Regions:
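Accessory "access/gating" subregions that flank catalytic or transport cores
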Residues: 79-186
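Broad gene-expression machinery/nucleic-acid interaction feature
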Residues: 7, 16-20, 51-53, 71, ...
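Catalytic alpha/beta core of large soluble enzyme barrels
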Residues: 13-54
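Single conserved hydrophobic/aromatic residue that forms the stacking wall/gate
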Residues: 1-12
C-alpha cells in the first residue's frame, strides 16, 4: 500500500520539415509586422506551413523590433506551421538584457555567446523556401474568415467559384470585386 504507479505518455511526432521565408529590401513606411505575415499567408496559404517549422529571414525581419518579431513568430501557426523563429541578433540581446528574469552579468555574456552560434549556417538546405520583395508589401486587411483571405488596403476582394470562399464572403457581408478602401473596419 502507499505506492504510486507512474505512467508515462508520449506523443509520437514526425520531425518537422524546415521552411525559410525571406523578405528582403525596403518596406513601405506604413507597413507593420502584422502586414508582413498577412501578406506572406495571403500568398502561400493557411496550410503552407503544415508540418514545418518556419525560419523568417531577410532585412525586413532583421530591422524589426523584438515585439514585431514575436508577432511574426506567433502568427506562423496561422499558416499551419508548428512554430516560427527569427535568428537571434543584437536586437534580441538588447531585449533580453536587463529583464527581470534574464541572466545577469557573466551568465548573460555566456548566454549571448551561445545564442550567437544559433543562426542558420550559410548555404543551409530547407525543405521549402519562399522569397518576397519587401517593396511589394503594403498594409493588409482580411476580408474573410481566415488570415489567408487578405488583400492590400485599396485592392478589391478577388472572385472565386469556390463554395467555401462564397460562404465566407456571405458570412462577412461582403461581395467579390468590392474595393476594401471604403469598407468600414469592425
Amino acid at each position: 500500500h502507499g505506492r504510486i504507479r507512474r505512467q508515462r505518455q508520449m506523443c509520437i511526432r514526425d520531425r518537422p520539415k524546415s521552411m525559410r521565408v525571406t523578405v528582403s529590401g525596403n518596406l513601405h513606411p506604413s507597413v507593420q509586422p502584422k502586414d508582413i505575415i498577412l501578406y506572406v499567408i495571403s500568398k502561400l496559404g493557411t496550410d503552407a506551413g503544415t508540418g514545418h517549422f518556419v525560419e523568417f529571414a531577410g532585412t525586413a525581419f532583421e530591422q524589426m523590433s523584438m515585439e514585431g518579431r514575436m508577432t511574426i513568430c506567433n502568427m506562423s501557426i496561422e499558416m499551419g506551421a508548428r512554430g516560427g523563429m527569427i535568428a537571434p541578433d543584437q536586437t534580441t540581446f538588447d531585449y533580453v538584457s536587463g529583464r527581470e528574469f534574464a541572466p545577469k552579468e557573466e551568465a548573460l555574456k555566456q548566454k549571448i555567446a551561445y545564442w550567437k552560434t544559433l543562426p542558420t549556417d550559410e548555404g543551409a538546405a530547407f525543405d521549402s523556401e519562399h522569397h518576397f520583395d519587401a517593396a511589394d508589401i503594403r498594409p493588409m486587411i482580411t476580408y474573410g474568415t481566415n488570415p489567408g483571405m487578405g488583400v492590400k488596403i485599396g485592392e478589391t476582394i478577388p472572385t472565386s467559384d469556390d463554395a467555401s470562399f462564397i460562404k465566407s464572403l456571405n458570412y462577412m457581408g461582403l461581395k467579390a470585386g468590392s474595393n476594401m478602401l471604403h469598407m468600414p473596419i469592425s
